[in-house]
Each structure stands twice: as C-alpha cells, then as structure tokens.
C-alpha cells in the first residue's frame, strides 16, 4: 500500500485500467454495427424485427449494467480500505442479486412474451411480428447470462482488472459475427440464426467471467457459487446505489424512443440522416465514456482509502483527459463523415443533412459534454446516485425531449432539433453537475462502514 504522500494511481496504472475499457467499448460498438448489417441481408421484415426487439434489449442491458455498477462501487470502496473480506462478501451479493433479478425478469417476459410485444409495438405487419417473437424468445433466454457477465465484469474492473473483460468481450463479439455468418448465410436460419448466435456469445461471456472470478491471485476470489446466500444488508446497499442508476439509464432509453418517434414523422431523408448521425455521434463519445467507467473504480478506491482529496484530483484529471479525447474524436469523425456516407450509399440529400448535423455536433460537443457526463461518473462512485438520477431525468425530459418535439412540431425544424435539444441538455447538466461537484456535498455519503 502506498503512503499518503503518493497518488493512489500513477499514469501507468491509469493507462492500464482505462485503455482496455476504451477498446472494449469501441469494438463492441463496431461489432454491433456489423451485426446489424449482416442481419439486414435477410430482408426488411427481419431487420425491422431485430430493430424493434433490440430497443427492449438495450433497455434491459442498461438497467442490468447500472445495477451491477452499484455493487462494483461497494467492492471498489472496500478494496480501497484494504477490506478484502467485505469486498468478497459484496461481490458474492452482486452475483446473487443479478442472477435473481435477471432470471425473474426473463421468466416474466417469457410467460407474457406475445402480449408484451403486441402492447409495446402495437399493430405491425404479420411477418415482422412473427420474426420479433422468434428473436425476442432467444433474447429473453440470454438475460440471465447478460446479468452474470455484467456483474462479473464490474467486479473485475473494481479491482483494476479491465483487461480480462475486454478480451472476453472482443472474443464474444467475433463469435457472434462468425455465428451469424454460419447460421444466417450458411444454414439460412434468418432471424433465428442471428438470435441463437447472440445467445451463444452471451453464454460464453457469462461462463468465462464466472470462471475467471475463481482466480485466487486476485483480491476478490469466488469459488463456491452454490453456497452463496442472501446478505440483506449488503443487498440493500447494492440496490440503493444500483436502482437510481438503473432508472436513470432506463429513462435515457425511453427518451431516445420518444425522440425516435418524432423524427420518424419527418420523412425518409431525415430518418436516414438522423440514423447515420446517431451512429457517428455515438462513435465520437465512446472513448470518453470508457474513461468515465474507469473513473468509477478510481474514485471508489480513493474514497474507500479515506482520501477524498485524491477523488477530487482524479475527477479533475480524467475530465481534462476526456476533454482532449472528445476534441480529437469529434475532429476525426468529422473528417470521416463524408467518406462514410459515400461508402454507405446514402442519398445526396441525406448525406448532406448528416454532414450538417455532424458539423454542429463537432462544434458544440466539446463545449459541454465532458462536464455533463464525466464528473457524474465519479460522484456516483461516492454514492451520489439520487442527485444524478433526478438531475439527468429532469434535464432530459425538459431539454432533450420536450425542446426537440417543440422545435419539430411547432417551428418545423428538421432533425437538427434533436441536436439543439441535446446541446441544451448537455449544457444544463454541465452547469448543475459543476455546481454539485464544487459544493463537495457529494462527498457526504457513506457507502461502506469505516
């Protein structure tokens, strides 16, 4: 253990933690795009079904990811305080909670699968609904494995091991692409082939991450999984952190769906331009999001060690790093936008509109995005999750959703209204979270017993 005259993390240790997370986020996004492109070759009914069901999948994945992060915060703080015993106890409860919740969710949705699809999507073409039912069935089977992987990967990152989750994720993504090629093109299984391939890759992730948690060379080692029993005090702490974060992530997805329904009324040119802009905007933010995920581990361990000044220092340090990364990413994506729209075969009108929106994003995103997202990652690691949830939900519905709908439907703005709303959301969040950060009230939470 370092003495108090040294920083808890040196630059080499930060790179070792952050780079694998960034690579994992980037490759997962690129592989997801490739996966969608492969499924699109099956036909319009297939791609429509996958797109519809994926909107549910993303909602579930984000909620489970937030819950597992709640447990990882406990683990990282206990490890920071050199309390390996309670870190291991917390890790076991994270796995327990994630298995119970994901299995219950999967079972509920399996029982009410058809009514759920009809309620959520309403009247769609028969072929689309048939394909949706097939794809949704296999997606539901994968929920427990998503929960297990999210829990295991979060536990690994909490002990500064981000390399193993990256390797698992990369291998599983290539497995998914290979499985699609065999089952969709080789065996002609269509949507069912895509769903089975995804299920197999998720089972692989869960099995490998659970196996790797048995490594007794790591601070957290879990061996006898079937002997895990509920510890209600720890479960309560996990849920107190995880549930607000889960609600926050879920609300973002609902907001996206509301915006998507508004854009869908603007015509095919706007829809195509907005779809490509979404992909490119997501791409230029991935590296900074990876830094934010790593920041949660760093701040958690600092606070566990009782070094609040270090937590403040690293939030500032990694926010500056994120700003540099965002500027570089925005400029790179801006330079690649025209070649990408040409390779994608977009219509000239859609390509022109996409380039206009990316130009706007390149200008405004470096101004406020980092302050609106990166410090909150660190403050959540301190247990400041309710403030983050309330702020994020309010600014999203007030600015991102309401302003977008108002500008589109009242003033006749095109899809640029989405990004005006987004920028106003980022700016308001940045102001509120900056005030919160400098108030130091986020440091008053007690996630673990000292």
Question: Where does each model-flagged region fall?
Answer:
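Short alpha-helical transmembrane segments in multi-pass integral membrane proteins
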Residues: 1-21, 75-142, 186-243, 299-365, ...
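N-terminal transmembrane alpha-helices
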Residues: 6-37, 41-42, 58-70, 74, ...
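Transmembrane helical elements of multi-pass membrane transporters/channels
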Residues: 16-35, 138, 172, 201-205, ...
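Transmembrane alpha-helix boundary and packing residues in multipass membrane permease domains
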Residues: 21, 25, 36-37, 73, ...
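Residue-level hotspots within the lipid-embedded alpha helices of multi-pass solute transporters
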Residues: 25-29, 62, 102, 106, ...
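Helix-terminus/linker motif at the lipid-water interface of multi-pass membrane proteins
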Residues: 26, 30-48, 117-126, 182-189, ...
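Small-residue-rich hydrophobic transmembrane alpha-helices
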Residues: 47-107, 146-165, 271-337, 369-393
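Short runs within selected transmembrane alpha-helices of multi-pass transporters and secretion channels
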Residues: 68, 138-157, 165-173, 194-209, ...
């Amino acid at each position: 253990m370092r003495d108090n005259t040294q920083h808890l993390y040196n630059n080499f240790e930060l790179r070792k933690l952050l780079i694998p997370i960034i690579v994992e986020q980037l490759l997962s996004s690129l592989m997801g795009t490739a996966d969608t492109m492969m499924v699109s070759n099956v036909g319009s009914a297939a791609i429509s079904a996958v797109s519809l069901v994926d909107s549910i999948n993303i909602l579930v994945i984000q909620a489970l990811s937030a819950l597992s992060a709640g447990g990882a915060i406990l683990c990282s703080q206990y490890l920071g305080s050199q309390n390996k015993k309670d870190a291991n106890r917390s890790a076991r409860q994270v796995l327990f909670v994630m298995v119970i919740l994901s299995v219950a969710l999967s079972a509920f949705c399996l029982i009410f699968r058809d009514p759920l699809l009809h309620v959520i999507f309403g009247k769609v073409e028969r072929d689309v609904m048939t394909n949706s039912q097939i794809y949704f069935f296999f997606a539901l089977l994968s929920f427990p494995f998503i929960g297990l992987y999210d829990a295991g990967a979060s536990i690994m990152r909490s002990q500064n091991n981000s390399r193993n989750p990256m390797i698992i994720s990369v291998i599983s993504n290539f497995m998914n692409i290979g499985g699609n090629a065999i089952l969709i093109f080789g065996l002609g299984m269509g949507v069912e082939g895509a769903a089975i391939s995804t299920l197999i890759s998720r089972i692989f992730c869960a099995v490998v991450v659970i196996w790797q948690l048995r490594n007794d060379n790591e601070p957290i080692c879990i061996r006898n999984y079937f002997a895990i029993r509920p510890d209600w005090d720890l479960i309560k702490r996990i849920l107190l952190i995880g549930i607000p974060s889960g609600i926050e992530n879920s609300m973002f997805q609902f907001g996206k769906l509301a915006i998507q329904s508004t854009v869908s009324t603007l015509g095919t040119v706007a829809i195509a331009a907005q779809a490509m802009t979404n992909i490119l905007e997501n791409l230029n933010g991935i590296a900074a999001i990876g830094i934010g995920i790593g920041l949660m581990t760093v701040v958690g361990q600092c606070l566990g060690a009782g070094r609040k000044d270090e937590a403040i220092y690293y939030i500032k340090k990694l926010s500056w790093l994120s700003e540099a990364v965002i500027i570089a990413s925005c400029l790179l994506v801006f330079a690649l936008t025209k070649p990408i729209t040409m390779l994608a075969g977009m219509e000239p009108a859609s390509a022109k509109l996409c380039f206009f929106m990316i130009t706007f994003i390149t200008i405004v995103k470096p101004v406020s995005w980092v302050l609106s997202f990166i410090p909150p990652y660190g403050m959540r690691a301190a247990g400041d999750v309710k403030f983050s949830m309330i702020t994020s939900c309010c600014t999203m519905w007030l600015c991102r959703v309401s302003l977008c709908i108002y500008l589109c439907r009242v003033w006749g703005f095109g899809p640029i209204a989405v990004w005006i709303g987004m920028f106003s959301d980022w700016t308001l969040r940045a102001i509120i979270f900056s005030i919160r950060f400098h108030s130091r009230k986020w440091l008053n939470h007690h996630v673990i017993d000292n």
